C-alpha cells in the first residue's frame, strides 16, 4: 500500500476509496452479466480491515447501486418478464431478511459443501449441453412451476442474506431451468437480486453493520461497471452471457473449495 501512496501522492483514506471504486466497477460489470460480483467486492471490503459482518453490510450497500443500474437498463430494453418476477419479489425479500439475521449467529460452514456440489454439477451441465440457455423457450409460468419458482426465490433470498456472493448466478440457473435464455434469465435475476440486496441492507443498517463511506465509494464504481456490463450483455446476447457464466462459476467453485478446505 505504501508504494501506491508514493506513486499516486494520494492520502491513505482517499486511496482506499479510489481502490474500492475500481473494485466496485469490476464487480458491477461481472455481476450485471452473470452475478458473482461479490467475489470481487467482498474481498476488497475485507482488505480495508473491516469486521466481516460490516464488510458484508457495506457490500450490500454498494450492490444496491450496481443491481439498480443493471435493472434499469434491462427494464428499459424490455428484457424482464415482470409478470413472473413481481410474484417472486416478496419471497426473495423475506428470504434475504431471514438469511441476514441468521448470518450474525450461524456459521456458513455446513452450507458450503452443498453449494460446491451444486455449482460443480451445473458447470459440467452447461459445458456439455451447449444449447442450454441459448433459446428463449419460456411461456407463462403457472401452477406447479410457479410454486417451485416461489420456493426457489425464497431459498435464494435466504442464501443471499446468509452468504451472498453468487446469488445472481444461482438465480440465472433457476430462470434458465424455467425456460429463459441466458440473457433474459440474467435480466430477471437482476431484479430479484436488487430486492434481496435491499432487504439484507435494511437488516445490516438496523444492526449498525454498514460503513456508509466505503459502501458508497464501491457503489459509485458499481454503477459504472453495471451500466457497461448490462449494455454489453444486451448487445452480444446469450452467447456472451454463457461464456462469462462459465468463467464466473468456475472461479466461484475454486474459491469455495479453497475456503472450505482452509476451515477444516
Model-derived segments and spans:
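Membrane-interface alpha-helices at helix entry/exit sites of multi-pass transporters
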Residues: 50-59, 83-87, 179-190
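Selected transmembrane alpha-helices and immediately adjacent juxtamembrane segments
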Residues: 2-51, 136-186, 216
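Transmembrane helix exit motif
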Residues: 68-79, 116-141, 253-264
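Residue-level signature of the transmembrane alpha-helical core
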Residues: 21, 25, 29, 60, ...
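Hydrophobic alpha-helical transmembrane segments in multi-pass integral membrane proteins
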Residues: 155-165, 200, 205, 253-264
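Residues within membrane-spanning alpha-helices of integral membrane proteins
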Residues: 17, 60, 116-119, 123, ...
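Selective hydrophobic functional segments
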Residues: 57-110, 117, 197-243, 247
Amino acid at each position: 500500500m505504501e508504494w501506491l501512496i508514493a506513486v499516486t501522492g494520494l492520502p491513505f483514506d482517499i486511496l482506499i476509496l479510489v481502490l474500492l471504486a475500481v473494485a466496485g466497477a469490476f464487480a458491477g460489470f461481472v455481476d450485471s452479466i452473470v452475478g458473482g460480483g461479490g467475489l470481487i467486492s467482498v474481498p476488497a471490503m475485507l482488505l480495508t480491515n473491516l469486521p466481516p459482518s460490516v464488510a458484508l453490510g457495506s457490500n450490500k450497500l454498494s450492490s444496491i447501486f450496481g443491481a439498480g443500474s443493471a435493472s434499469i437498463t434491462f427494464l428499459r430494453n424490455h428484457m424482464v418478464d415482470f409478470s413472473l418476477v413481481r410474484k417472486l419479489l416478496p419471497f426473495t425479500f423475506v428470504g434475504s431478511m431471514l438469511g441476514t439475521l441468521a448470518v450474525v449467529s450461524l456459521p456458513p460452514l455446513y452450507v458450503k459443501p452443498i453449494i460446491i456440489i451444486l455449482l460443480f454439477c451445473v458447470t459440467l451441465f452447461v459445458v456439455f449441453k451447449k444449447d442450454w440457455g441459448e433459446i428463449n423457450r419460456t411461456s407463462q409460468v403457472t401452477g406447479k412451476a410457479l410454486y417451485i419458482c416461489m420456493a426457489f426465490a425464497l431459498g435464494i433470498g435466504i442464501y443471499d442474506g446468509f452468504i451472498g456472493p453468487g446469488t445472481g448466478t444461482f438465480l440465472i440457473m433457476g430462470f434458465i431451468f424455467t425456460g429463459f435464455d441466458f440473457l433474459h434469465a440474467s435480466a430477471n435475476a437482476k431484479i430479484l437480486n436488487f430486492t434481496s440486496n435491499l432487504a439484507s441492507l435494511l437488516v445490516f443498517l438496523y444492526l449498525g453493520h454498514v460503513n456508509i463511506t466505503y459502501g458508497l465509494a464501491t457503489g459509485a464504481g458499481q454503477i459504472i461497471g453495471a451500466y457497461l456490463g448490462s449494455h454489453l450483455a444486451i448487445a452480444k446476447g446469450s452467447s456472451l452471457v454463457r461464456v462469462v457464466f462459465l468463467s464466473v462459476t468456475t472461479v466461484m467453485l475454486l474459491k469455495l473449495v479453497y475456503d472450505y478446505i482452509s476451515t477444516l
